[in-house]
Amino acid sequence: MRVLVVCPVHDPRDARIAEREIPALLAAGHDVTQAGPFTAVGAIAQPGVRPIDIPRSVGRKRARALRHTRRMLREQAPHHDIVLLHSPDAVIAASGLDHAGIVWDVHEDTAAAVGTKPWLPRALAAPAAWSIRAGEAWAERNVHLLLAEHSYADRFARSHPVVPNSVFVPDAVPRPERGRVVYLGSVTRARGARELIEVGRLLADGPAIRVDVIGGAGPEVLGDVEVARDRGWIAWHGYVKNSVALSLVDGATAGLSLLHDEPNYRHSMPTKLLEYLAHGVPFVSTPLPLAVELAEVSGGGIIVPFGDLGAAYDAIVELNADDDRRQKMADIGREWVRANANWAIDGAAFIRQLEEWARG
């Protein structure tokens, strides 16, 4: 099977694309071409993958990337059995393409997220969301859909296969030690940048628990993040490859997820929570519905109210002080992920589904 993976929006090193799906395809013996903004983000393709460099679609500057992606698809799609799209921009670029193997991997709710984008004027948020929903309806009629969340099914009229954003579970992990908590993911206002900084300040002034922040910072919070780093409130690592980032998670006291109550977060499982548990680290999270559910069914997390810095601080300090509780939460959470959110299982289902569509 020859697969063309296309995304002009995300970093080509995106964890679902580059560390789950592409390795699964290569391991199954399939040929992979990846079209993405390699030059724009300073990335290189992984071994075994043929790269195609395209401009990045970002903010209001999308027309050039759309034109290049559309032209690339017309040239490359006929030579591939599956064209795997990873963003609405890629779906737009593929419109009108006569190819039976086009697949849209839906792994975010762009219409719900558009209101949080700092580059979009508030007055345009509702029309933009409507346009995206209309695009989803068009895609459902014209291409195959693969959903990353069961909750995404409500956005579509028909049923579609689900391949969850599950994670790799290492064979062995270190014990969760005292003195260090981690945050893994993009650092933006909606993802709790202010809360991370303030919790870091409280912890630095109190029990001296370090806050490792692993991820690139959005322009609206970059200055604040740099100040917090310089003052020693957080240890900011910036963007690093997911596999490297996870090595920094190993052995932490707790993993943090202080996301705000935004529409696009309400129906998505924060993958970072699964990654924390898979690496033997309990989590502290705000009460988004799927985070609450995960804390309950796995036993590996503590839920704190939105914006409640005191509650987040207390949860971290309590976990830091109680070695037995911390280890128990880590152990049972890790076993839950192994049984219920394991890419070793879901990756095989992903391959089977693409092979079925490729056969027609």
Language model segments and positions:
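A short, well-ordered alpha-helix in the C-terminal region of glycosyltransferases
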Residues: 318, 325-340
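Nucleotide-sugar-dependent
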Residues: 16, 191, 241-248, 253-274, ...
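Membrane-proximal helix-turn-helix segments that form the acceptor-binding/catalytic region
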Residues: 23, 67-77, 92, 104, ...
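Conserved donor-binding/catalytic core segment of Leloir-type glycosyltransferases
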Residues: 4-6, 146, 173-201, 212
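Glycosyltransferase donor-sugar binding loop
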Residues: 210-223, 238
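Conserved acidic donor-binding segment of nucleotide-sugar-dependent glycosyltransferases
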Residues: 297-298, 302-310, 318-324
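N-terminal strand-loop element at the rim of the active site
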Residues: 5-15, 19-64, 76, 152, ...
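Nucleotide-activated donor-binding/catalytic signature segment of Leloir-type glycosyltransferases, i.e.
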Residues: 222-251
